[in-house]
């Protein structure tokens, strides 16, 4: 295009300048307006983080981190109330202690009174599993003896969940025997003390290879008891069958050692004659009638309890 005079060129320049100014004005107006933004959702966890059946379940992540909850606290706060993630762990972990409650990792997640396996750390609920074993029999549903507390076999953490006695770098739960398993019998001044027999001083042991207990008062290491009794933690009902702790395990005869066997118990099978508060004998069928008075560290004779 050719322009023959300066006036036409001037008008053309004014025209283009007007268009540019108009476009600039429109652009500035658009920029000054709020632009709707759809912020992308940022997620740290993979799908299935709340699903126990998922490989991405957060319980598995904590297990893989050797039960270190600090990684959770980085986003959910030290008290698990939400933190920067703005998602409180107490939405699901509703019991006192939240994620650090005893029944979170082992026991019944729905029942704060059942803090020991089952469930075991591996999720198993069968008593034939090493992690489950006889926990229920010892702590909750003992039909033949007084129930015990956790500290009779384990150290209870003094400073909370992360206490070194609870969370450490060694796999499995440490067995630290309490006072009941170490109870001495035939002590001087006790009921029917026999100086010739000496003191019976248990030296409790736990065999990690097979999960067995030995030399414990609770399973036979007492005066007139079966000192060499070894019981598997997974033995189920056979671990406490009549005759295992005192008497003859093969026949089920519960008669403790008599003088002819190196003991001091009278050779009588009429248990209830002397121990009526504890046991009944109906035609050879022995039934514990008061479990609170059996395996409780005392000798119950004629409705009275004695040190022995």
What are these regions (language model features)?
Residues 1-26:
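Sec-dependent bacterial lipoprotein signal peptides
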Residues 28-66, 73-74, 78-308:
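Flexible linker/context regions in extracytoplasmic redox proteins
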